[in-house]
C-alpha cells in the first residue's frame, strides 16, 4: 500500500484510466505506461483512497461542481527547471556539500574554447548560440505534443545559468495534474539523453 493505509486496512486496487495509456518513448522494449486511481477494497463497492493525490484532485473537482462554485477549474502551471553539464554531491563525517556546473555560466568565462558565455542573470529569453539547450527543450516539447499535451512555449529563465521554463496551454485541473506527471517524466528523461 506504499504507506497510504494501516496494515489492518491495506487491501487496495489500482483502477487504470485507459485515457492516460501511452507507449513509453524511453524504453527500448515497448512498455505501456498508464495512470489510474488507487481504491480501497470495500463492501459493497470500492471507494477512492482519500490520500491518493489523483483522487484528491477528482474529489475537489466534484466538490466544486456539487457546491455550484464552478463547472470546471482551469490552471496553467509553469515548469521551471535546471539542466547542468555537471552535478555532484558529497557527504563526509565532517561536511556535506554539492556542486553544479553549466558551460554557458558566467563563471566559466575564462575557460578556453567556450566563447558563448551568458553574463550573470542575463539568461532570460537568450537565443542561440548562447542558448545551448534549445534543441533539447524543443525535443521535450515535441515529445509532449506527441502525447497530446499542448505547449505554449519554452525559453531560458532569468535566474542562474541552466534555468529554463516550459509552459503548457491552459487546462482542466485533473487533466493538468496528469499532464504534470508526464511533463516532469519527459523533462527528466530527455535531459538524461
Named regions from a protein language model:
Residues 1-193:
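Glycine-rich, acidic/polar active-site loops that bind/position phosphate-bearing ligands
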Amino acid at each position: 500500500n506504499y504507506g497510504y493505509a494501516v496494515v489492518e486496512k491495506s487491501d487496495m486496487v489500482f483502477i487504470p484510466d485507459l485515457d492516460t495509456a501511452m507507449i513509453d518513448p524511453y524504453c527500448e522494449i515497448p512498455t505501456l505506461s498508464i495512470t489510474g486511481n488507487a481504491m480501497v477494497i470495500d463492501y459493497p463497492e470500492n471507494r477512492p483512497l482519500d490520500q491518493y493525490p489523483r483522487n484528491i484532485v477528482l474529489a475537489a473537482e466534484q466538490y466544486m461542481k456539487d457546491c455550484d462554485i464552478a463547472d470546471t477549474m482551469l490552471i496553467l502551471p509553469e515548469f521551471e527547471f535546471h539542466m547542468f553539464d555537471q552535478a555532484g554531491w558529497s557527504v563526509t563525517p565532517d561536511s556535506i556539500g554539492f556542486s553544479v556546473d553549466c558551460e554557458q555560466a558566467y563563471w566559466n568565462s575564462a575557460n578556453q574554447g567556450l566563447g558563448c558565455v551568458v553574463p550573470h542573470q542575463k539568461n532570460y529569453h537568450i537565443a542561440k548560440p548562447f542558448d545551448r539547450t534549445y534543441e533539447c527543450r524543443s525535443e521535450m516539447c515535441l515529445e509532449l505534443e506527441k502525447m497530446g499535451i499542448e505547449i505554449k512555449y519554452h525559453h531560458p529563465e532569468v535566474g542562474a545559468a541552466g534555468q529554463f521554463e516550459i509552459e503548457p496551454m491552459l487546462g482542466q485541473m485533473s487533466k493538468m495534474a496528469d499532464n504534470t506527471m508526464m511533463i516532469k517524466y519527459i523533462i527528466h528523461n530527455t535531459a538524461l539523453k
